[in-house]
């Protein structure tokens, strides 16, 4: 029997209708895995050995009672076959410390999804720089004058922090906007933090597409997140509506270009964000949108993931 651990935000507070981690747990349970539940505070390191206080878990598709804890035990993380790291951002120093603990278990043979070192290496906004020919024009800087020059060149830009999620603190700055200076100062904290600027992509009106990649293989359907009227952000957390649809030709091209690199880095479950034919983000920490896609199309994305995990464990 496969022993699967999951590190996640409190399960008591999730929305099971759209929670991807919950979908993963349902599929793992369907396959007869033993489920071990952990939150960040349950992980610890003693003399170099990664350990955790885990609770065995059963889940069900029931809006009144979707989980039940069984026994509680202190275990070596290496006693688990696989651990899903599904803690949502912020990607802060605490998150980084947790990846080091998980990496100690990985060195003893436990499969970590996604690979701890690659979680540290691949910032969701910045990692697109390794595929610059696929992205919008992009500037990463602390310098207000550079941001202003980029805005003057393009006339219509998006500015965002490097560590936001769910569309937080994303600004669209159009030609002639008198607020460019204060937005630059706010995002860079007066030149003390890096931020990102990209040329505005009108294709956002048709949605910001979440394309999932499982162990290097693109999922054939995506979720287009369409902004509300007057909004430039499609993120569901920012009020966008989700519309599942098949991948376009350019979606396939981008996912097939990026997929092999992700697989080689041990990034087994990744969400690409694509606007039109441009790659805008590579989400590696806790990608979502599985349930919305699975509700619309006859596909089991979590099944693809568990197949990939089983194949890696069999090696």
From Swiss-Prot:
Q: Which residues bind ATP?
A: 151-207
Residues at which Mg(2+) binds? 281, 283
Please provide an example of a Pfam family that matches this protein in its UniProt record.
GSH-S_ATP
Q: Which reaction does it catalyse?
A: gamma-L-glutamyl-L-cysteine + glycine + ATP = glutathione + ADP + phosphate + H(+)
Which superkingdom does the taxonomy of this entry point to?
Answer: Bacteria
| Documented EC number(s) | 6.3.2.3
Q: Which GO terms describe its molecular function?
A: ATP binding; glutathione synthase activity; metal ion binding
What is the UniProt remark on how the cofactor binds and its stoichiometry? Binds 1 Mg(2+) or Mn(2+) ion per subunit.
Catalytic EC class: ligase
Q: Which cofactor does it need?
A: Mg(2+); Mn(2+)
Listed under GO cellular component are:
cytoplasm
**UniProt entry tagged with the keyword Secreted:** no
Q: Which residues form the ATP-grasp domain?
A: 125-310
Matches recorded under InterPro entries = ATP-grasp, ATP_grasp_subdomain_1, Glut_synth_pro, GSHS_ATP-bd, GSHS_N, PreATP-grasp_dom_sf
Q: Which key words tag this protein in UniProt?
A: ATP-binding, Glutathione biosynthesis, Ligase, Magnesium, Manganese, Metal-binding, Nucleotide-binding
Q: Does the keyword NAD apply?
A: no
Metabolic or biological pathway: Sulfur metabolism; glutathione biosynthesis; glutathione from L-cysteine and L-glutamate: step 2/2
NCBIfam families of this UniProt entry?
Answer: glut_syn, PRK05246.1
Q: What protein family is recorded? A: Belongs to the prokaryotic GSH synthase family.
The protein's name: Glutathione synthetase
Species:
Salmonella typhi
This chain is encoded by the gene named gshB
């Amino acid at each position: 029997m496969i022993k699967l651990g999951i590190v996640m935000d409190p399960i008591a507070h999730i929305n099971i209708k759209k929670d991807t981690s919950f979908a993963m747990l349902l599929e793992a349970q369907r396959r007869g895995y033993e489920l071990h539940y952990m939150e960040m505070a349950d992980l610890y390191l003693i003399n170099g050995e990664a350990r955790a206080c885990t609770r065995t878990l059963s889940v069900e598709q029931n809006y009144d009672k979707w989980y039940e804890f069984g026994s509680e035990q202190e275990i070596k993380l290496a006693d688990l076959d696989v651990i899903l790291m599904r803690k949502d951002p912020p990607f802060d120093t605490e998150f980084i410390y947790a990846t080091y603990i998980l990496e100690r278990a990985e060195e003893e043979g436990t499969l970590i999804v996604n690979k701890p070192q690659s979680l540290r290496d691949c910032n969701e906004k910045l990692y697109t720089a390794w595929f610059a020919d696929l992205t919008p024009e992009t500037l990463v800087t602390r310098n207000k004058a550079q941001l202003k020059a980029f805005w003057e060149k393009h006339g219509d830009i998006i500015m965002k922090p490097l560590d936001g999620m769910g569309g937080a603190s994303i600004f669209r700055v159009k030609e002639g906007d008198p607020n460019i200076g204060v937005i630059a100062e706010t995002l860079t904290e007066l030149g003390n933090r890096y931020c990102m600027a990209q040329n505005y992509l009108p294709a956002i009106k048709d949605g910001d597409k979440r394309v999932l990649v499982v162990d290097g293989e693109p999922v054939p359907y995506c979720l287009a997140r369409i902004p509300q009227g007057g909004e430039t952000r499609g993120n569901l957390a920012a009020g966008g509506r989700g519309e599942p649809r098949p991948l376009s030709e350019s979606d396939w091209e981008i996912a097939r270009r990026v997929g092999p690199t992700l697989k080689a880095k041990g990034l087994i479950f990744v969400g690409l964000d694509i606007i039109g034919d441009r790659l805008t983000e590579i989400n590696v920490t806790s990608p979502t949108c599985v349930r919305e896609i699975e509700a619309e199309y006859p596909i089991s994305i979590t099944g693809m993931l568990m197949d990939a995990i089983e194949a890696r464990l069999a090696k």
